Structure formats: structure tokens, C-alpha cells
Amino acid sequence: MSEQNMSIAIDRHHRGMTLDSEQTAIVVKNWNLYYGSKQALHNITMKLPQNRVTAFIGPSGCGKSTLLRCFNRMNDLIDIVSVEGEMLLHGENMYAKEMDVAALRRRVGMVFQKPNPFPKSIYENVCYGLRLQGINDKNVLDETVEWALKGAGLWEEAKDRLDENALGLSGGQQQRLCIARAIAIKPEVLLLDEPTSALDPISTLAIEELIFELKKDFTILIVTHNMQQAARVSDYTAFMYMGDLIEYTDTDSLFTNPQVKRTEDYISGRYG
């Protein structure tokens, strides 16, 4: 990473913060995940701060996306997955037997690597989640669609074409639409799984600037293979390797003064 980019990244972060001084959104305690008999996550313990951006970095196969999918129980969809440990969202056990998983996924929204708009109008894409909740009042839907598209930085480009098929949008616009769809139901946490890896540099910049704004209203967890992106957009960064959480601290410290040699080796490009 160039010194100029690192300086820009540091300037954008909230100075003087530490994990201990932050309000906590999610607590992870002794978290283990298995695919059958193969253990993929090893004893993960961490606190994820509220209204901050936390990035997960590490080489392919390190477990960062697997961990991300634990936060809204997407791994439940894989038959051979089993988990151990505790995961709390604002004090509630996310894996309690009585937890309504559908309700949890409304509280913890997710945007995937490849834009996946529905083959519906832009308007219907954004209000899809509201309709699933039985909300059909046109005034409510109209207000929410405008709010979500503005929040996703897409309103000016889409306001005169809300009835057009969302598949006619560019890749970058489609990804911002997916973000609008995710925030329309006002989740507490937003998960982003490599949200710009399929986008061009201009669209990537738009998404990164959007992430910086969205943390005012949402707790954001982002998986990225791009260390420069992690440095630019996140307040905290977790480095993972082979299913282990190696180092987790504020982003400035991790990139400028890593405390673990394996972290230093990774961010300096010695492996990964």
C-alpha cells in the first residue's frame, strides 16, 4: 500500500478509538464451526463495535466469509455445518433455539459478491422485504424506496426510472440497488461479502464512499480480499488465517504496526 493511500485511509478513520471504548453490537465467544468432521473456524472470540466498519481480511480459504455468514445464520442452509460457542446480537443469543431465524435475517442484512437484483422493477426490488412483512401502504413504500435509494447513493440515477427492470442497470448500479434493498428493512447490521470484487474502479469507489456514510446508521461487517480497500473503508480490521483469528484491532494499528508476525507477513505481501 502506498504511503499516500495509507495516509488518506488514516485521515478518514475516527481517531483515538479502541475496541474497549466502543459500544458493542455483536459479541462472539469461543466460536467453532465444522463442515462435517472438518473444523473451519477455531475458537473465535471478538467484540464487533456498533456503527463502525469492521473488515475481515486474509488469504482465500481462511474462513472470513464463513464467519460472516454465521452472523445471519446463512450457514444453517448447509446440512453438514455444526457450530459451538456463543454469538450475541445486542445481548440476544443468535443461535438460541427460540430465535426466529427469519427475524434475525431482517435484523442482519447481507449483500453478496455478485449483484443479484430480482427480475423486477427497481421500485419492487427495494420494497421486496417490506412486502414480505405485509407492508403494502403506498405512502410507506414510496417513502422507504426514496430513503433507501438515497441511502445507497442511487436515487438521482434511478428516480425517473423506478418502473424499469432492475436488470437494465449497470453492474455498479445493481450492487447499490442490492444495498438499498438490504437497508430498506432497516437492519441493525449490514454484512458485505466482497461487495466490489466484480465491479470496475469507478463503481468500487462509489460503494466505498457509500460504506463510509452508511455506518452512521448501521453496523457494517465487510469481507474483502483487497487490503487497500480494508484500509480505506474500515475502522477495525480482523486478520484471519486457516480458520484462526490472528489479530484484531483498529485498522490504523493493524496496517502500520501489526503485533503478530503472520499479520505483518500477509500485509507486506510475503504470502497470501
Curated annotation (Swiss-Prot):
GO terms for molecular function: ATP binding; ATP hydrolysis activity; ATPase-coupled phosphate ion transmembrane transporter activity. SUPFAM superfamilies: P-loop containing nucleoside triphosphate hydrolases (SSF52540). This is Phosphate import ATP-binding protein PstB. ATP binds at G58, P59, S60, G61, C62, G63, K64, S65. Residues 26-267 form the ABC transporter domain. It comes from Hydrogenovibrio crunogenus (strain DSM 25203 / XCL-2) (Thiomicrospira crunogena). It is found in: Cell inner membrane. It comes from the Bacteria. Part of the ABC transporter complex PstSACB involved in phosphate import. Responsible for energy coupling to the transport system. One of its GO terms (biological process) is phosphate ion transmembrane transport. One of its GO terms (cellular component) is plasma membrane. Its EC number is 7.3.2.1. InterPro entries: AAA+_ATPase, ABC_transporter-like_ATP-bd, ABC_transporter-like_CS, P-loop_NTPase, PstB-like. It is a peripheral membrane protein. It catalyses: phosphate(out) + ATP + H2O = ADP + 2 phosphate(in) + H(+). Belongs to the ABC transporter superfamily. Phosphate importer (TC 3.A.1.7) family. Pfam families: ABC_tran. The complex is composed of two ATP-binding proteins (PstB), two transmembrane proteins (PstC and PstA) and a solute-binding protein (PstS).
